[in-house]
């Protein structure tokens, strides 16, 4: 009687990175290209280099059948000013009968997340809005430590010092209510476009600042947002590196 060949495991690990304003998402996909089922797949990620923190536990894929993919996401934050990030992952799994354990690893990924250096370039408000509509964006809101009317010019000057051109500025005040809006634009050395719009508003004792950032290149969203937020927090007297 002819014996059938044992089914083989063929596990491939495919890493990737996605960008958010306040986090980097490290993505690890485990693909089963073999004929046997893998069980108890554990994916452990680790920052190998750079001023970053990854404090999430290992992620599990209980069953990975042939031809299927299991994916885990890990959120990475910056300890201080972002720099170069190197991240990797280890994958442990068992064969279908649970008798033999296996390990695999994701090739390390290294990416430069330093905030871009910009130069101010004037464009018309209409052109700024048109560029912003075609850019990747992120929004943020901060509670201001003092009234919006005093904080607004401080914020505007701080952004100008970061190499951004002030395109437009509008203020409105009536009684205890104040609203200030300003838009900025700049280019980095590769001529990637960046923009920021801030809206400071206050009524009675409550004041907030809305921040809207736009980037032309996805990989610069994290660093640019960090720079804008840090500059604003420092200018108004808040710790620059806190979330």
Map each language-model feature to its residues:
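Short, hydrophobic beta-strand segments
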Residues: 70-80
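Short proline/glycine- and polar residue-rich coil/turn motifs
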Residues: 61-70
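Short acidic, flexible loop segments centered on an aromatic residue
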Residues: 31-51, 90-92
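A short interface-forming secondary-structure element
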Residues: 31-33, 60-62, 214, 218
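Acidic, serine/threonine- and proline-rich intrinsically disordered appendage/tail regions
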Residues: 1-20, 80-243
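Structural beta-strand segments of beta-rich domains
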Residues: 22-26
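Short edge beta-strand/loop segments characteristic of extracellular beta-sandwich folds
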Residues: 27-33, 75
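Short beta-strand and strand-turn-strand segments in soluble, beta-rich domains
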Residues: 9-10, 39, 48-60
């Amino acid at each position: 009687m002819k014996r059938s060949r044992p089914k083989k495991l063929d596990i491939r690990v495919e890493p990737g990175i996605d960008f958010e304003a306040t986090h980097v998402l490290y993505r690890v996909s485990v693909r089963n290209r073999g004929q046997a089922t893998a069980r108890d797949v554990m994916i452990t990620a680790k920052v190998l280099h750079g001023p970053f923190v990854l404090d999430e536990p290992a992620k599990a894929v209980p069953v990975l059948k042939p031809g299927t993919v299991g994916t885990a996401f890990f959120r990475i934050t910056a300890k201080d000013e972002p720099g170069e990030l190197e991240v990797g992952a280890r994958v442990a799994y068992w064969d279908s009968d649970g008798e033999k354990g296996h390990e695999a690893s994701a090739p390390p990924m290294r990416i430069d997340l330093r905030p871009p250096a910009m130069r101010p370039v004037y464009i018309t408000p209409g052109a700024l809005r048109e560029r912003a509509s075609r850019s990747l964006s992120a929004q943020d809101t901060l509670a201001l430590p003092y009234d919006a009317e005093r904080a607004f010019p401080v914020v505007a000057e701080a952004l100008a010092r970061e190499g951004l051109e002030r395109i437009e500025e509008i203020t409105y005040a009536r009684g205890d209510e104040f609203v200030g809006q300003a838009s900025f634009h700049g280019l980095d050395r590769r001529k990637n476009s960046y923009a920021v719009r801030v809206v400071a508003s206050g009524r009675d004792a409550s004041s907030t600042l809305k921040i809207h950032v736009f980037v032309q290149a996805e990989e610069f969203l994290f660093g640019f947002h960090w720079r804008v937020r840090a500059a604003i927090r420092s200018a108004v007297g808040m710790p620059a590196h806190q979330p």
